[in-house]
């Protein structure tokens, strides 16, 4: 049995187990790759592969740990209560306005380039509205994920930087022609939000709000004793400073999150008893997310260490018949959907993209065009169980990963299609070389 086939079977088995809910993602991420690695004969060195995978995802795990603690602490202090209060008054109990607002807020927050931070902030602001009006949280999770996938194409976002690095291209030159496609993707999401809004209107109608709402009605924070209204401006400046430093890149993101959390704790809860209470209040959420991140390290470590990723990439490229060569740009866009879903962004852009670019060059398709086309699948990529921030998103929303994947797959794929068509229309990449 070829290594590529084993790799595809491993991913298919994993997806089947979690989508049929026969195994939790945490357990499947550990057990499935281990069994398939042993089946492929990689008894020696298996532990080293796992450790390598854990090392690569360790910074992400640390970042998420302290990001959840920091933004949860900010929520506890009441920092987001005024924002949610303003939103509640603006939407006037209309589910459609809430859904459209979710897309707009996520698009703005996504400019920081980090999906985890985006999810934490937008969830803190929007989830209370969905709970209050008993709206379907799968709508929220779908809209946030696909919006984040569209906004992920900014030059400081991971995929664009990877594609530029892999083919030695200028990120800014790579990015600018993609802007019309991104705008089209966001327009599609607004229409999707309107569609979801009509469904919610039929289901729950327009919620009548009291003429006068007290502070408790508008609060996101769950523990009144943890609120710090006198420190709201300090906390706001702290969050803004964190986001500025994040974009500026003066320190690694995990370090920034650790420092921000420590400062927030000292300023808002100076006594150790209060600090322990705040940490304990969010420990369950932290454990659920970080545990999945490290389990994903086992999966990606084995996928890379065994050489399955390279073998899978070559097999995918090898099935493209010569007569389709001139159409390498749209083919690359199409391949980016399953490609970035089944293997990590690193594996796709550093392993598969150079092969696709080389194949395209033989038919007159420039590497720049192939690179742009390869970014079209990002909304579907975020559905992948290999994406750490996806676990954070579903955990914060309290929805099942498999339910989210089934619900969001078609909208995400349609958004990719819209971006691809517009990308070809504005000549970001050609239909035919």
What role is predicted for each listed range?
Residues 1-5, 55-61, 87-101, 132-140, ...:
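Membrane-interfacial loop-to-helix junctions in multi-pass transporters
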Residues 14-22, 71, 105-114, 145-151, ...:
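Transmembrane alpha-helix interface/packing and boundary motifs in multi-pass membrane proteins
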Residues 27, 46-81, 107, 254-255, ...:
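Core transmembrane alpha-helical segments of multi-pass membrane transporters/permeases
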Residues 128-213, 220, 366, 376, ...:
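Membrane-core helix-loop-helix motifs of multi-pass transport proteins
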Residues 63-66, 93-125, 319-358, 362-363, ...:
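Hydrophobic alpha-helical transmembrane segments of multi-pass integral membrane proteins
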Residues 1, 39, 176, 180-278, ...:
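Long, contiguous bundles of hydrophobic transmembrane helices that form the permeation core
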Residues 82-85, 117-129, 157-169, 311-312, ...:
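Re-entrant/interfacial helical elements at transmembrane boundaries that shape
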Residues 4-15, 22-41, 61-68, 232-243, ...:
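Hydrophobic mid-bilayer segments of alpha-helices in multi-pass membrane transport proteins
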């Amino acid at each position: 049995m070829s290594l590529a086939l084993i790799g595809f079977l491993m991913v298919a088995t994993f997806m089947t187990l979690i989508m049929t809910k026969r195994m939790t993602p945490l357990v499947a991420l550990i057990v499935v790759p281990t069994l398939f690695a042993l089946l492929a004969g990689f008894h020696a060195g298996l532990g080293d592969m796992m450790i390598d995978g854990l090392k690569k995802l360790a910074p992400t795990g640390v970042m998420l740990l302290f990001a959840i603690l920091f933004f949860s602490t900010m929520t506890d202090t009441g920092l987001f209560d005024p924002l949610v209060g303003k939103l509640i008054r603006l939407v006037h109990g209309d589910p459609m306005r809430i859904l459209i607002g979710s897309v707009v807020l996520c698009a703005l927050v996504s400019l920081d380039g980090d999906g985890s931070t985006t999810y934490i902030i937008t969830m803190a602001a929007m989830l209370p509205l969905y709970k209050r009006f008993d709206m379907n949280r799968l709508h929220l999770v779908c809209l946030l994920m696909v919006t984040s996938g569209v906004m992920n194409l900014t030059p400081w976002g991971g995929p664009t930087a990877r594609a530029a690095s892999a083919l030695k291209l200028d990120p800014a030159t790579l990015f600018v022609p993609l802007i019309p496609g991104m705008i089209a993707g966001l327009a599609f999401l607004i229409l999707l939000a309107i569609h979801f809004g009509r469904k919610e209107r039929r289901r729950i109608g327009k919620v009548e709000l009291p003429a006068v709402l007290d502070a408790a009605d508008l609060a996101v924070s769950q523990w009144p004793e943890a609120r710090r209204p006198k420190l709201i401006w300090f906390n706001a400046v702290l969050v803004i400073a964190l986001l500025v430093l994040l974009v500026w890149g003066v320190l690694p993101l995990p370090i920034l999150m650790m420092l921000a959390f420590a400062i927030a704790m000292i300023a808002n809860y100076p006594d150790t008893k209060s600090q322990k209470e705040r940490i304990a209040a969010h420990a369950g959420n932290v454990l659920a997310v970080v545990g999945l991140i490290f389990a994903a390290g086992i999966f990606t470590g084995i996928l890379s260490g065994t050489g399955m990723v390279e073998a899978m990439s070559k097999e995918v490229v090898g099935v493209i018949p010569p007569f389709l060569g001139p159409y390498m740009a749209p083919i690359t866009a199409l391949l980016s959907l399953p490609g970035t879903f089944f293997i990590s962004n690193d594996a796709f852009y550093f392993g598969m993209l150079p092969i696709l670019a080389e194949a395209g060059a033989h038919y007159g398709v420039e590497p720049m065009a192939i690179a742009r086309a390869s970014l079209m699948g990002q909304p579907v990529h975020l559905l992948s169980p290999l994406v750490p921030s996806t676990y954070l998103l579903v955990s914060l929303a309290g929805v099942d990963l498999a339910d989210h994947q089934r619900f969001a797959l078609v909208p995400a794929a349609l958004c990719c299609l819209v971006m691809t068509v517009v990308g070809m229309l504005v000549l970001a990449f050609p239909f035919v070389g």
